[in-house]
Amino acid sequence: MLECYQYKKGGINSINMKKKVIVQLRNFEKKDALVLSERIYQELTTAQIEDMICLWNTKQHDGKYFEMFAIVASGKVVGRLSLYSYKDKTISIGPEIFPEYRGKCFAKAAMIKAIGIAKEKGYSMISQQIRVDNEASIALHTSLGFEMVGIPFVNSKGNNVCMYEKSLR
């Protein structure tokens, strides 16, 4: 059983999913351009999104390992998840679930799969920046064994964030 967290105004509700939550992580394909256009990249043309998908599928960004996955449940793309190597043996995992699919344990199931991929690729640490006001993400990461390290700071995007880390050893 997965324990998941659903954000509600005024706090986080813990929900237990009695049924197994099955998600697939797969690389984005050109056919996913419409979903990405509707959900995230309204300002881009289909051709621009297809070009971006091709770049993602090179599995590199700035000379480092990077992979963008579609999170798929019951045949529908319900979100996306990125893996990015930013230090030797340290990786960042960035999940995003589309609003209408939140609270259904898709983020937790996808994170569990992504942690497995990171281990398979030989990473020993996951390090995340999480906005201090993102209660759902903090609850998700804490439930997966991440711990806050250091003190809150303002990142390069101007957001107040904390670092959360998890050892893979």
Give, region by region, the residue ranges found by the protein language model.
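Long, contiguous binding/interaction regions
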Residues: 83-85, 140, 161
